[in-house]
Amino acid sequence: MNAEKSPENHNVDHEEIAKFEAVASRWWDLEGEFKPLHRINPLRLGYIAERAGGLFGKKVLDVGCGGGILAESMAREGATVTGLDMGFEPLQVAKLHALESGIQVDYVQETVEEHAAKHAGQYDVVTCMEMLEHVPDPQSVVRACAQLVKPGGDVFFSTLNRNGKSWLMAVVGAEYILRMVPKGTHDVKKFIKPAELLGWVDQTSLKERHITGLHYNPLTNTFKLGPGVDVNYMLHTQNK
C-alpha cells in the first residue's frame, strides 16, 4: 500500500486496517471473529433488498466490503456487485471465496473517494455497512457515496450510536463479556449519533427514507430489526 497520501486517499486509518488484516483469514469462519457479521447478514440483505425494490439486475457497490460477506450475498440475488476496501488481505480472502463459490464480484482496493472520482453516478445501490466508524472522516465517505449513486438510486449506511448504552453493549458486552468480536474492534469515540449522520446526509443530494435499529437479545442469542436506534442502526437514503 502506498504510504503517500493523495487528496483522495487521505481518509484511511492504517491502524484500523491492520486490525482486520490480522484476522482476515478467518473471515468466512462461521464460528470465528466474524460470526456476528454472518448472523446479521440475512437481516441486512433483506432490509436492503426490500427497501431498494429488489437487487436483481442492479449495479451495486459495497463500500468497506471486507471479506465479502454482504457483497457475495447481494451477487447471489442477481446484482452486479463491486466490493471496495483498503485492506489487502481481506480482499484476497474475498476474491478466493468468490472463486470457490462460483460467485462473480469485482473487488477493488481503493478508497470510496478515489472510486467516486472515476465512477460518479454509476450505481443503482451503494451500501456502507459498519465502515463509517473506522475512518478518520466519515462525512467524506457519505459525500462520496452520494456522488456514486444514480439519480433515484439507494444508499444504505449502518453504524453504531455514540452513548453509554452502545459502549456497554458493543464494547464491554460484545468484546469483553460475550467475546463476540475481538477486543479493540470498536472505539466508542468514533461511534456516530443518528443526528450527526443525518446532518451529513442533508448536505448531499441524498434524502432520508427510513431508519431502523438492529437489536441483539443475549438471552435468545438472536438479532432483529426494529424501532430504537440507541445502539446499532441502519439508514436508507435515496438520491434526489
UniProtKB/Swiss-Prot annotation:
PANTHER family: METHYLTRANSFERASE, UBIQUINONE BIOSYNTHESIS O-METHYLTRANSFERASE, MITOCHONDRIAL. This is Ubiquinone biosynthesis O-methyltransferase. Signal peptide: none annotated. It catalyses: a 3-demethylubiquinol + S-adenosyl-L-methionine = a ubiquinol + S-adenosyl-L-homocysteine + H(+); a 3-(all-trans-polyprenyl)benzene-1,2-diol + S-adenosyl-L-methionine = a 2-methoxy-6-(all-trans-polyprenyl)phenol + S-adenosyl-L-homocysteine + H(+). GO terms for biological process: methylation. Keywords: Methyltransferase, S-adenosyl-L-methionine, Transferase, Ubiquinone biosynthesis. Its EC number is 2.1.1.222, 2.1.1.64. Belongs to the methyltransferase superfamily. UbiG/COQ3 family. Pfam families: Methyltransf_23. It comes from the Bacteria. HAMAP family: UbiG.
